[in-house]
């Protein structure tokens, strides 16, 4: 993997970081998570580690996957980098803080992918509809390739329709939309994640993998 300024950049606008040392057998499903608005409370364009707060219930979700030996993979769009609001250095600090907050709850993530490409960006990051940017499925497919995942059996949790579309296009069949509505997108069944009952349904799905 090419690195830039010490960061795990597979290309100028794509961060791919293995954040655990766990080895998974090929063919495992994964739990894909969006970051901002799903793991942590969304603050717009997050560049301040001190502002990071975990969303209620997310530690339980990750704990269930950790206990089942299910890879936990973060897939996050970060257009603020392309727009010049902050750089990879700020992203790294914020992301480290999010992972540290999870570690304080004794849960962990296995891989983080972040896409900085956006049509409103500048320079090498000014690419419209980049295949790695959700709703395109590139980050999920890249994680699937690197970890040997069974994408069809994998689950996703996100707070935007783009998360669900990316999952559908990557071949997943089950997703949960934070504060959203249930729906069907092709073969992807989308469940809402709004209350304790919805959370129990997600935990049961993870425990059944």
Where does each model-flagged region fall?
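Short, active-site-adjacent cap segments at secondary-structure transitions
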Residues: 39-40, 79-83, 119-121, 163-164
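Short glycine-rich loop/turn motifs that provide flexible caps or phosphate-binding loops at active sites
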Residues: 36, 43, 79, 83, ...
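Active-site neighborhood of HAD-like aspartate-dependent phosphohydrolases
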Residues: 2-73
């Amino acid at each position: 993997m090419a690195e830039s300024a010490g960061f795990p950049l597979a290309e100028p606008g794509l961060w791919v970081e293995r954040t655990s040392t766990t080895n998974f057998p090929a063919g495992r499903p994964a739990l894909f998570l969006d970051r901002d608005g799903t793991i942590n409370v969304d603050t717009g364009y997050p560049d301040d580690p001190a502002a990071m707060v975990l969303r209620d219930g997310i530690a339980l979700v990750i704990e269930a996957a950790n206990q089942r030996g299910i890879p936990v993979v973060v897939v996050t769009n970060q257009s603020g980098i392309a727009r010049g609001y902050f750089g990879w250095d700020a992203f790294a600090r914020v992301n480290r803080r999010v992972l540290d907050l999870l570690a304080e709850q004794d849960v962990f993530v296995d891989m983080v992918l972040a896409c900085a490409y956006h049509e409103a960006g500048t320079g090498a990051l000014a690419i419209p509809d980049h295949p790695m940017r959700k709703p395109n499925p590139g980050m999920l497919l890249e994680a699937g390739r690197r970890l040997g995942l069974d994408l069809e059996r994998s689950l996703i949790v996100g707070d935007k329709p783009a998360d669900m579309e990316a999952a559908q296009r990557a071949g997943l069949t089950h997703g949960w939309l934070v504060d959203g509505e249930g729906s069907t997108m092709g073969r992807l069944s989308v469940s809402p994640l709004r209350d304790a009952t919805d959370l129990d349904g997600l935990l049961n799905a993870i425990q059944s993998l």
